[in-house]
Amino acid sequence: MAKVDIHPIWYPDAKVYCDGQLIMTIGSTKPELHVDIWSGNHPFFTGSQRIIDTEGRVERFMRKYKMEKD
């Protein structure tokens, strides 16, 4: 026998907010979703991605284990 009332309530028009601004409407099990990052403000998707590597991994390893490059 199948259990009754085990599924969550589905909200077909759940609102997604980022910084208090309505971003989109989706289907969800919660009526409102508040996000910090979404594709509209993420650096990877907006093209403002910067790679910050002040110290290379090899140099860091060499310095950490006090080794010299050959």
UniProtKB/Swiss-Prot annotation:
InterPro entries, per the entry: Ribosomal_bL28/bL31-like_sf, Ribosomal_bL31, Ribosomal_bL31_A, Ribosomal_bL31_sf
Record keyword Chloroplast present: yes
Pfam families the UniProt entry points to: Ribosomal_L31
PROSITE patterns, per the entry: RIBOSOMAL_L31
GO terms (BP aspect): translation
Cellular component GO terms, alphabetical: chloroplast; ribonucleoprotein complex; ribosome
Record localization: Plastid, Chloroplast
GO-annotated molecular function: rRNA binding; structural constituent of ribosome
Keyword rRNA-binding appears in the UniProt entry: yes
Keyword field: Chloroplast, Plastid, Ribonucleoprotein, Ribosomal protein, RNA-binding, rRNA-binding
Record's subunit section: Part of the 50S ribosomal subunit.
Alphabetized HAMAP family for the sequence: Ribosomal_bL31_1 (MF_00501)
Function of the protein: Binds the 23S rRNA.
Similarity comment text for this entry: Belongs to the bacterial ribosomal protein bL31 family. Type A subfamily.
Protein name in UniProt: Large ribosomal subunit protein bL31c
Organism expressing this protein natively: Porphyra purpurea (Red seaweed)
Lineage, opening ranks: Eukaryota, Rhodophyta, Bangiophyceae, Bangiales, Bangiaceae
